[in-house]
C-alpha cells in the first residue's frame, strides 16, 4: 500500500475525529481553530476555541467586539498579534459584505492568514484540493522520503509544498490533511516515535538509514535576546496602577504595572534606589520585600523579571498609569508573566 492510502487507513482507525473543529465545515470556526492552534497545543487550544466561539459565534459578533474584549479572551495563549489579526480580519470580512471568502486567494487576503491557514480553511471548509504543510507535515515527509533540504529556507518550503500537493487525495483533501497532521502529532512525534508500530516504517527512509532524530533539518538559528524588567505593582489596598503596553513591542496592547527596564542585570540595591526616585512624592509607601524574581521565556526572548508589590496610601499620578479597582482587574488583558507575579505577590486578594 502506498503512502497516501496507508495514511488514510491509519487515520480512519487512530485519528482525532472528535475534535470540535473537525465536526463542522463552517469556515469561520475552522479559521478560529487554525489561528488558535498556531504555537498552541491541541489540549490547551480546544479550551480557548470553545470559549472563543461561544463568546463570538459569528464573524459579525467578533467584528463588533472591542479589541480589549478580544485580547482578554485570548489572555494566556500568547502571540497576541494573532488575536489582533483575527479581529481586524473579521472587520475586513464585514466591510466586504459579511460573507466568509470561498476561494484561496480571497481567504489568503485576510489579515494574518498565511499559505498554511488559507490551505487549511479551503480544504476543511470547502473540500478544495489544497495541501497543508505545518511542523507535523514537514517532519513526516522529511523522515519518510529522507529529505535533507532545510525546511526553513525558500528551496525547502517550495520542495515540501510541491511534495505535499503531489500526495494529496483529490477526493478527500480534508481527511488527508487531518491524517498527516495527526500522524505527525501522535505517531511520528519529534521525540521517541514508536517506529516499530508505524505502518510506514518499512519504506521510511529515515528509519532505514538511522536518521529519525536528524530529520527534518533547519538551517537557521535565531538569536535569543535577553531583557531585564523591573515591575512595580503599586496599589492602595483596593486599586492598582496599570498602563497599556505600546505598539511595536512584545505584549502590544496588553496591560501592565509600572515598568522600569534595564539594559543589563542590575542589583536589588540599585533597583530599590530607582523605586524611591520614581515614588519620591509618595508618603508612607511600603515596599514588600524580598522581591519576586523569575525568568519568563518567549520564542526569541528571555525575560528576567523582578517584581515588587508597593503599598501607597495615596496612589501617585504617574504618566498614563490608571487606577484599576481590584474587583475589575479581570477585565484587563495582561501577559501571563504579569498574572503569575500578581498571584505570587497576592495582589488583589
Residue ranges of model-derived segments:
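Intrinsically disordered, low-complexity, charged terminal extensions of DNA damage-control enzymes
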Residues: 1-17, 23, 185-349
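Catalytic cores of DNA base-excision repair glycosylases
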Residues: 3-196, 200-213, 276, 280-284
Amino acid at each position: 500500500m502506498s503512502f497516501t492510502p496507508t495514511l488514510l487507513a491509519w487515520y480512519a482507525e487512530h485519528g482525532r475525529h472528535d475534535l470540535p473543529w473537525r465536526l463542522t465545515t463552517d469556515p469561520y470556526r475552522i479559521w478560529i481553530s487554525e489561528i488558535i492552534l498556531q504555537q498552541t497545543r491541541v489540549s490547551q487550544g480546544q479550551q480557548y476555541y470553545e470559549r472563543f466561539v461561544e463568546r463570538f459565534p459569528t464573524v459579525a459578533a467578533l467584528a463588533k467586539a472591542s479589541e480589549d474584549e478580544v485580547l482578554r479572551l485570548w489572555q494566556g495563549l500568547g502571540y497576541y498579534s494573532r488575536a489582533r489579526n483575527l479581529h481586524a480580519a473579521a472587520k475586513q470580512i464585514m466591510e466586504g459584505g459579511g460573507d466568509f471568502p470561498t476561494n484561496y486567494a480571497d481567504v489568503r487576503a485576510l489579515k494574518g492568514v498565511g499559505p498554511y491557514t488559507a490551505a487549511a480553511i479551503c480544504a476543511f471548509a470547502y473540500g478544495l484540493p489544497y495541501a497543508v504543510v505545518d511542523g507535523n507535515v514537514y517532519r513526516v515527509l522529511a523522515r519518510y522520503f529522507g529529505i535533507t533540504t532545510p525546511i526553513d529556507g525558500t528551496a525547502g518550503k517550495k520542495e515540501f509544498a510541491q511534495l505535499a500537493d503531489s500526495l494529496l487525495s483529490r477526493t478527500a483533501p480534508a481527511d488527508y490533511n487531518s491524517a498527516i497532521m495527526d500522524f505527525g502529532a501522535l505517531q511520528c512525534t519529534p521525540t521517541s516515535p514508536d517506529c516499530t508500530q508505524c505502518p510506514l516504517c518499512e519504506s521510511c527512509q529515515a528509519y532505514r538509514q538511522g536518521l529519525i532524530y536528524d530529520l527534518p533539518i533547519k538551517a537557521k538559528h535565531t538569536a535569543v535576546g535577553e531583557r531585564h524588567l523591573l515591575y512595580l505593582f503599586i496599589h492602595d489596598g483596593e486599586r492598582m496602577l496599570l498602563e497599556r503596553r505600546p505598539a511595536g513591542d512584545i505584549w502590544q496592547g496588553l496591560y501592565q504595572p509600572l515598568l522600569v527596564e534595564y539594559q543589563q542585570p542590575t542589583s536589588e540595591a540599585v533597583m530599590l534606589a530607582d523605586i524611591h526616585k520614581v515614588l519620591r512624592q509618595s508618603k508612607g509607601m511600603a515596599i514588600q520585600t524580598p522581591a519576586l524574581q523569575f525568568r519568563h521565556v518567549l520564542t526569541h526572548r528571555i525575560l528576567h523579571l523582578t517584581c515588587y508589590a508597593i503599598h501607597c496610601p495615596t496612589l501617585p499620578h504617574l504618566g498614563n498609569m490608571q487606577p484599576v479597582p481590584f474587583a475589575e482587574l479581570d477585565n484587563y488583558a495582561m501577559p501571563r508573566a504579569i498574572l503569575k507575579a500578581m498571584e505570587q505577590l497576592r495582589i488583589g486578594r
